[in-house]
Amino acid sequence: MKKPVKYLCVAVFVPALLFAYVYSHDGARSAAGSDTLLLLLPDAVDSSTPAVREWLDAAGEEGLHLQPIHDSEFLNPLSSFHARGVILPDQLHRAANDVLIGELYRYVRNGGNLMVVYDACTWDLNGRFPPGDSRLSSLVGVRYALYDEYTTMTMEPAQVTGTSAAMREIGIPPGSFVPVDNDGNLDRWRQVAEREDADSRFAFATYQYGNVDYPLFRTLGDFDGTVLLRSKRWLAAGYRQEELGHVLFVNLPLGYLASRTDGLLLHSFLRFFAVHMLGLPYLVTVPDGIGGLVFNWHIDAHSSLRPLKILADEGVFDRGKFSVHFTAGPDVDEFGDHKGLDVLHDAETQKWIHYLLARGDTIGSHGGWIHNYFGSHLDDDDEGEFQKYLEMNKDALERVSGTRVTEYSAPVGNQPSWVTRWLERNGIVAYYFTGDAGLGPTRVYRDGKRDAPDIWAFPILHMGKDASLEEMGFDDVPISAVRDWQLAVTDFTVRQHAARLIYTHPYGAERLFGTLRTWLDYADALQKQGRFRWYTMTELAEFLTQRESVRWTVLQVAPGKVTLRATHPKTLAHETWAFPQESYGDARVVKGQATVRMQDGMIFVTAGEGRQLSVEFSARGDVDRSAPESTEAKR
C-alpha cells in the first residue's frame, strides 16, 4: 500500500426474547441478548453497506456481539431489546431529530450504557448543526459541536495524548504511543515506569511519519468523568455516569479512520466499552487463549544470506516457528543487476529455504520477483503489467520448496487493493500490512469498501516511526530502547491474550543480535510457562477463518446463573472465551469438553474436540440485573 497519511478533519425490530442471543459472525439477524451491543442507525442506512459492515467486522474480530438496529425500532414502544449497550457511530448517524435525542437521555438515565462517537447526532434533519452546542452535550459531559461559535473551525486537527495508564487501559500497543514534551514534540519510545508521573503524557505515533494529528470537535467546559485522551485544549475521549447509566464519549472519527486503514482506535474503543466498562464476555482471537507474536522475516537480496547464516549459527531459527518471505528473482533494483536471490537457480538460496522448512517455518512470497523495482513502481492501476511478477515469485517458491505458498509481504509496504484481490484468488490467506498499524489480524477497509472478502491482513507493530530492526539502527535508536520495546510488546500480547506481528530483515537483526537474543530468551521463558507462543501468519489466518463458523449463545437460565452454549460444524477445539471475573464466577462444564483457568482477571474457557459445548457460570451483581436495566431503560 502507499505510505500512511495524516488525516485532516472533514466536516431491529426483533421480538423480545427472555434470555438468548445467538451470535453469527456473518451478521445474520438474531435476537439481541444481555451480552449484545446495538449499533444505532438511521432508517435510511442499510445495515449491509460497507460502512456498517466495517463496524460489525471490527466487533466480530474482537469476539463481541454487535447488532444493527434502526431508529424506528429503537423508538418503538412495543419493542424490547435485551442488550447491554448502544453505540452511536460517526459518519453513519450524523442527523437525528429531537425525539431520538430525548429517548437517548431516558435510556441512559434509566440504566443504559451509551457510546457516542464524534459527529453522531450532531446535525438536525436538515443537515445543519442546531443552535448552541450538541444536543447530547449534557449527556456526554462536555459542550461540543459549537458551530455558532467556531463555524468552519468547529473541528480541528490536533495531537491526542493520554497517560500511560490510559493507553494501556484502552489497549494501545507499546510503540503506537510515545512520550511527548510540553511543546508536543515526540520523544523516543521508552519503557513505562511502574510508577509513572501523573503529568507524563504520551501521544499517538504513526509508522514512518511519527507525529499524527486527529480531527476533534472543540470542546468547552470541565469534564466531570474520567478522561482517557485529550488534546492540549479539548477532550478526546472519556466516560462518566449519568444517573443510573454510563456514557463513553469518543471525540474521534473512529469509523472514518478505520475506512482509511487506521483501525486501531475503532477496535480499541469497542473492546474498552464492551469488556472494561460493561464486563462482557468475548471470543478470544488466538488458539487456547494464549497470546503471541508473528515474527515475519523479509529476505529480498543475495546480500541477505550472509547475515542469515550468522543468525542461524547463533540458533535464532531454532527458537520458534516464523514466517519467512523471499523475493525469488535474480535482480533487485533493475533488471540485469544480478543482486537477487535467483531462487530457481541459486543452490545456496535453495539450501536456506529447505533449512527453514525443516525447522517448522512457513515460506512466504515477498512481492514480485524484483524487490525494489516492483515496490517502487507498483500502482493502483497497473495490474496488467505487474501481475506476472507476483505469479513468477509465487511459482518459483512453490517449485523449490515443494509446498503451497499461503502468505505474502509487499516490498516497501506497497499494497494496492488489486494485489490483495489477486492474492486471495491465488490461495494466499494472509499478508503483511503497513496500514492499520498496531492491530492484530484484520480485514482491511479502503475507499468505502473491503479490500477482499476472506484474506487476513497482518498489520505491523512499530516503535514510533520505525518498525523493522534495521530502521531502528539507521535512526540510531538506543539498543536499550529496542530491547525494552521488544519485551514490552511481548508482554502486551501475553496480557491481551492476542497476537501481533513484528517484521525485520536479516541485516537489521544481525546489527542488534544481543538485543534479539535477550528478547528471544524472554519469549522462551514465557513459552515454558504456557503464556506465550510464536505463530505463523498462515496458522493464525486458518484459525481465524475457522473461528468465523463458531456460533455461541449466552443464556441467563435462572437468577444468578448464566450458560455459555457454543457450536461449530466441525470442531470447537482451541476456541476460547474470556469472562471477566468481576462479573462471572464458578464455571462448570455441563456438556462437551473444555478446560477452565483463571488468569489476568478473566475466566478462560478453552474448548476441546467436539462440536458442542455448554458451560454454566454464576453471575455477579451487575450481570444479573444489567439486561433489564439497559434494555427497558428507555420505556
Predicted features, each with a name:
Residues 150-243:
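Catalytic beta-strand/loop cores that center a nucleophilic Ser/Cys/Thr
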Residues 47-130, 324:
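Helical hinge/lid and interdomain linker segments adjacent to catalytic or ligand-binding clefts
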Residues 122-123, 135, 143-161, 316-419, ...:
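Metal-dependent polysaccharide deacetylase catalytic core of the NodB/CE4 family, i.e.
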Residues 292-300, 461-539:
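Catalytic grooves of carbohydrate-active enzymes
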Residues 538-582:
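Surface beta-strand/loop "capping" patches
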Residues 98, 599-634:
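C-terminal beta-strand-rich structural cap/linker in extracellular carbohydrate-active enzymes
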Residues 94-187:
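A glycine-rich, often tryptophan-bearing local segment used as a flexible ligand/cofactor-contacting loop or short
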